[in-house]
């Protein structure tokens, strides 16, 4: 089976961490660079309390990233995460937190202030498959256990903006080295 040597690339340059930093810094366009992501990525989401949905292609993925960035919903983090790395995928499981618009939570049927921003807590599982050149094929994201779920209304002074996040994360965002074609099967 061909391998992209993802374990060694993850150890040296951490592509999934780079994607997270770029996303939370509002620099999502860089995630869709052809060196990092295939031309037609496929994203699947199964979020508690919502209908599952998919995104096909960079245009749809970019629309979601763009919306999250414009509304400060691209700010998220994961704690207590376990990560497994294989030849063609990275899997993470942990407790995720994401700033989320009250209006979107209300549209999903939750009794919240639609004008507020919330910090949403959930148990999540994420899978990032990669091709032979270590380019992202997409994402699968599941909120799998509502027992640990939480929703915290944020005081406007506690909302982290994309500009603030970018200032904090930019020093940690380093470009990946070029893909080494010698890793491809002969």
Regions found by a protein language model. Name each.
Residues 20, 56-60, 120:
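Soluble or luminal CAZymes and related metallo-dependent hydrolases
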Residues 8, 56-57, 161:
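Secondary-structure junction/capping motif
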Residues 1-30, 34, 181-186:
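Short, low-complexity N-terminal intrinsically disordered segments enriched in polar/charged residues
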Residues 26-104:
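A solvent-exposed, acidic/Ser-Thr-rich amphipathic alpha-helical stretch
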Residues 17-19, 32, 36-38, 64, ...:
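Broad hydrophobic/π-residue packing in well-ordered secondary structure
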Residues 20, 49-53, 112, 116:
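Conserved aromatic-histidine-acidic binding/catalytic patches
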Residues 1-5, 72-75, 79-186:
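A beta-strand edge to alpha-helix "cap/lid" segment located at domain peripheries
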């Amino acid at each position: 089976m061909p391998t992209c040597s993802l374990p060694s690339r993850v150890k040296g340059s951490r592509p999934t961490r780079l994607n997270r930093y770029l996303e939370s810094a509002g620099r999502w366009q860089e995630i869709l660079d052809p060196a990092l992501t295939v031309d037609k990525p496929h994203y699947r989401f199964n979020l508690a309390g919502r209908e599952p949905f998919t995104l096909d292609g960079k245009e749809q993925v970019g629309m979601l990233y763009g919306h999250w960035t414009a509304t400060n919903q691209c700010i998220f983090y994961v704690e207590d995460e376990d990560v497994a790395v294989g030849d063609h995928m990275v899997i993470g499981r942990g407790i995720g937190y994401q700033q989320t618009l009250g209006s979107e939570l209300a549209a999903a049927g939750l009794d919240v202030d639609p004008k507020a921003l919330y910090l949403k807590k959930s148990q999540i599982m994420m899978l990032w498959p990669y091709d032979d050149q270590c380019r992202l094929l997409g994402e699968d994201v599941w909120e799998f256990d509502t027992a640990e779920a939480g929703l915290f209304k944020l005081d406007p002074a506690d909302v982290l903006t994309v500009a603030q996040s970018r200032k904090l994360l930019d020093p940690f965002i380093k470009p990946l080295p070029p893909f080494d074609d010698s890793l491809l099967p002969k």
